[in-house]
A protein has these predicted regions:
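Signature of N6-adenine DNA methyltransferases within the class I
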Residues: 10-11, 15-24, 45-53, 60, ...
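Class I S-adenosyl-L-methionine
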Residues: 1-76, 82-101, 121-123, 136, ...
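A short beta-sheet element
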Residues: 402-435
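C-terminal substrate-recognition regions of SAM-dependent nucleic acid methyltransferases
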Residues: 8, 229-394, 436, 444-445, ...
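Short, solvent-exposed loop/turn segments at the edges of secondary structure
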Residues: 76, 224-228, 415-417
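Conserved SAM-binding strand-loop segment of SAM-dependent methyltransferases
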Residues: 107-119
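Short, ligand-facing micro-motifs at secondary-structure edges
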Residues: 214, 399-414, 444-455
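Conserved acidic residues
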Residues: 39, 79, 130, 210, ...
């Protein structure tokens, strides 16, 4: 990534690739030895030439090793190596870099087959490439400018809050010939994002996935925090099986984990990556119809926590104690709602002078540019309001091991924010639920979800916790709870 240019990175997704990653990707793809001679290869988002520099160097060296004369090597560079990038500064630097490398082999005045334009509108390479490699741009759809309409023409990128790199996967697949290989490093989010569903369905249908290498928490790029995956596909690969690896960031090499099938890792419309045994376990948790012993929900979403919650909030008729689940700390909270979750009218909510003064002094922070109205003191969202008057169990949403969990009982009349909470649907001792969560098994389960966060942490959502607790209580305990819910009697929409 270009230093000091975060806005540009956000808009066009430039994150330049370190050489050791380039070398690994080319090795995974099989762009090695003299077999690369007279093989078409393209980087369709080449930037300043991180991939093309190594490609040119390998092509020259292997051609020399095979006894190819310089004039023929020059023609090969012009004919078989291709690149595209729409950033003129990076593009010009790429040309300079390639000229410098070629010159070191005694080759000059090359007419490179490089294009300074948008890859998404180019069709002349479709069906012609032996290799498509690269590090495509990562740009969320709401940051796209003129390329938005081009992106939406790609089926991989027309669902949900999409990302530009999904379109580049489809673009790359289109470029491959009948035996071509594609190898990209991209965010790992395509395995579990709603936006990438069409791509996952394509992989299930085509069975062209050769290997996935998960970099996990390892950060391959300078000045850019992203959790990445190296994906290798081949048009010549027609198998349900693929190899799964994890990348060792210290050794800069990958370690084989297991050969698994696409069907084994495709669970509830998402891809999960692990060995066969743990994928079977995860599949059971995610798909077996457990009894609904508990419900798990998100805490308050005031959208102005500093106004409603804090140690300086005045005591009043609408003040309750509220737990910040992410830290385990308690604060006062202004809760202008009745026991049915309905907003209190101004004459009640603002009856305490200290509360009225507090709200009025922070009115702009609550309204956030919206027009003023009498009940301006309401929360941004209504979630968790009704459950204030129930006993709950609070849980944070970040962990590395089970020791990072913060689990606390929250009594009826108290609130929760910045985390999740668990409600019993039948009488279950607090300790039983805690024991389910503080086990190493739960922490490992969360790690399998691969929702990476900085610092080596993983995160999880309400559905993840609810499925796990209900699965364990249904299938992995001998205890019988009163009023045990019957799966057959429950509304199956809950599952």
């Amino acid at each position: 990534m270009k230093a000091g240019n975060k806005t540009k990175t956000k808009k066009i997704g430039q994150v330049f690739t370190p050489q050791y990653i380039v070398e690994e990707i080319l090795n995974y793809a099989g762009y090695t030895s003299t077999t690369i001679i007279d093989k078409h290869i393209i980087d369709n988002s080449c930037g300043d030439g991180a991939f093309l520099k190594v490609i040119v160097s390998r092509y020259c060296q292997e051609s020399i090793n095979s006894g190819t004369p310089i004039n023929k090597i020059k023609k090969g560079l012009e004919k078989y190596i291709h690149g595209i990038d729409n950033d003129p500064v990076a593009f010009n630097q790429c040309v300079e870099n390639l000229n410098e490398i070629a010159c070191s082999y005694g080759i000059t005045n090359i007419k490179w087959d490089l294009y300074n334009q948008s890859s998404l509108s180019m069709k002349q390479f479709d069906g012609k490439m032996d290799f498509v490699v690269g590090n495509p741009p990562y740009v969320r759809v709401h940051n796209l400018d003129s390329t938005y309409e081009e992106v939406k023409q790609y089926s991989f990128a027309n669902g949900g809050m999409t990302d530009l790199f999904l379109a580049f996967f489809e673009l790359g697949f289109n470029m491959l010939n009948s035996t071509g290989k594609l190898c990209y490093i991209t965010p790992s989010s395509w395995i579990n994002s709603v936006a990438a569903l069409n791509m996952r369905k394509y992989i299930l249908r085509e069975k062209n996935l050769v290997s996935l290498t998960d970099l996990g928490h390892f950060q391959a790029f300078d000045n850019a925090t992203t959790y990445t995956l190296i994906s290798l596909f081949s048009k010549n690969h027609k198998s349900n099986e693929f190899d799964f690896y994890v990348f060792d960031g210290q050794k800069h090499e990958r370690a084989f984990i297991d050969r698994i099938t696409v069907n084994e890792c495709y669970i509830d419309s998402y891809f999960y990556l692990s060995d066969k045994a743990h994928l079977k376990w995860l599949n059971d948790i995610k798909t077996k119809k457990s009894a609904k012993y508990v419900s798990v929900k998100n805490g308050f979403a005031t959208l102005a926590d500093d106004v409603f919650i804090g140690s300086d909030i005045p005591e009043s008729n609408i003040t309750i104690k509220t737990l910040k689940a992410s830290t385990g700390k308690w604060y006062n909270c202004l809760f202008p709602y009745d026991k049915k979750g309905k907003l209190l009218p101004p004459e009640i909510a603002l009856s305490d002078p200290a509360v009225k003064t507090h709200f009025e002094s922070h009115k702009e922070d609550i309204l956030k540019g919206k027009p003023d109205y009498p009940c301006y003191y309401e929360y941004g969202r209504t979630q968790a309001l009704l459950d204030v008057w129930k006993d709950k169990i609070a849980i944070n949403t970040l962990l590395r091991t089970e020791k990072d969990l913060k689990i606390e009982r929250v009594k009826a009349g108290q609130g929760i924010y910045s985390g999740l909470y668990i409600i019993n649907n039948v009488e279950i001792p607090f300790e039983d639920i805690v024991n389910v969560l503080v086990s190493p098994d739960f922490a490992y389960y969360v790690s399998l979800l691969k929702k990476y966060k900085s610092g080596g942490y993983y995160t999880f959502n309400t559905k993840d916790v609810e499925q796990y607790i209900n699965y364990v209580l249904t299938f992995k305990t001998d205890k019988n709870y009163d009023d045990k819910p019957s799966i057959s009697d429950k509304d199956l929409r809950l599952f």
